[in-house]
Amino acid sequence: MGALTSPRKVVVLGSTGSIGLSTLSLFEESGAPVQILALTAGRNVERLIEQARRWKPSLAVIEDESRLDDLRAGLAGTGVEAAAGADAVRDAAAMGADWVMSAIVGAAGLAPTVAAARTGAVIALANKESLVCAGPALLAIAKAAGGSVIPVDSEHSAIFQVLQSECAHRVSRLILTASGGPFRTWDKAAMARATPEQAIAHPNWSMGAKISVDSATMMNKGLEMIEASYLFATPEDRVDVVIHPQSVIHSLVEYVDGSTLAQLGPPDMRAPIACAFAWPDRLPWPAPRLDLAAYGQLTFESPDVERFPAIGIAREALRLGGGAPAAMNAANEVAVAAFLDRRIGFLDIAGAVAGTLERMNSLGDLSVAESDAVETAMLIDGSARRIAAEVVAQKRQRA
């Protein structure tokens, strides 16, 4: 894509969540040339109505079918078509946009992201679960359709900007930074008593509840390791994690000659969204500027894998390959939901994920045929959720 002149046709999947809000905020502040074709949301019909009235998309979709009448009433007289359900979300993704923001949380984002990739659109990928569950297949689908996948996670956006594709064979390590989350300095006894309210209080980033809990367990970083391995064709043993509490350095690329390149910036998700929207151009907008003197110092430490076992679980899933990452992700979604519902403790989350992965591996349920990788990933997702629910129930009985 060259200079940003003519309007780009845009679909925002998950427009009412944190990333969706940041995307529309960026468009508002930058005056980016966009024509919104569709906005989709899960349950927040009030916010979706507000967005649709502002941006006048052709279509607004609420996944919760029970809210369709509310959506229609809220959009009466606007000319915006209202629809509901998972199929309608997939239809919105496949409308033929130039650029699709994939920001639906969880494995629910996989099918719409694949549908968008089949159209040849540029996929701005914030839904990390799509890559974790079916990364190689998703990337192949996008490439075959003439499209591309540009990561929106700040860590992968950093690597994307720093890593020159023609130099990929000269890379020795990818280094993902992690804030350490709200429990970075807590001991295990304190973590065992952690409440959902404490877990979602991220020190640097404004995120939804599920992603905030993933940051607290460091499963977020485990998922991102898998993403990085797939996105940048890098083996698991060459993807490292370092704790960087200030969240200023977003990731680093170490080359074989010992040189290390990093991308820096204030912790604001609109920056990687702007990169994904304009690449290889740059989008002028009133971005927060980095004042290194104000920070004074940037600090780093190794992750404590004993207190935060999720990183090791993710490495094991990546080593197992096949459907193991999809199973791990599904189990994590079930366990996090149980924690947010106060059915299990914070430290039970990683145990439930590890237990599910072990059971599925012992049953031989993790093999994936390349020809139907996406469909198989969805089946594995369902199986893992059922097993994870059993594991969670057992942990609750023992509590």
From Swiss-Prot:
InterPro entries documented for this protein: DXP_reductoisomerase (IPR003821), DXP_reductoisomerase_C (IPR013644), DXP_reductoisomerase_N (IPR013512), DXPR_C (IPR026877), DXPR_C_sf (IPR036169), NAD(P)-bd_dom_sf (IPR036291)
Residue sites binding NADPH per the record: 16-19, 42-44, 127, 129, 208
Reactions catalysed, as given in the entry: 2-C-methyl-D-erythritol 4-phosphate + NADP(+) = 1-deoxy-D-xylulose 5-phosphate + NADPH + H(+)
EC id: 1.1.1.267
Disulfide bonds, paired cysteine numbers: none
Cofactor: Mg(2+); Mn(2+)
TM ranges: none
Key words of the record: Isoprene biosynthesis, Manganese, Metal-binding, NADP, Oxidoreductase
Pathway noted in the entry: Isoprenoid biosynthesis; isopentenyl diphosphate biosynthesis via DXP pathway; isopentenyl diphosphate from 1-deoxy-D-xylulose 5-phosphate: step 1/6
The name this protein goes by in its record: 1-deoxy-D-xylulose 5-phosphate reductoisomerase
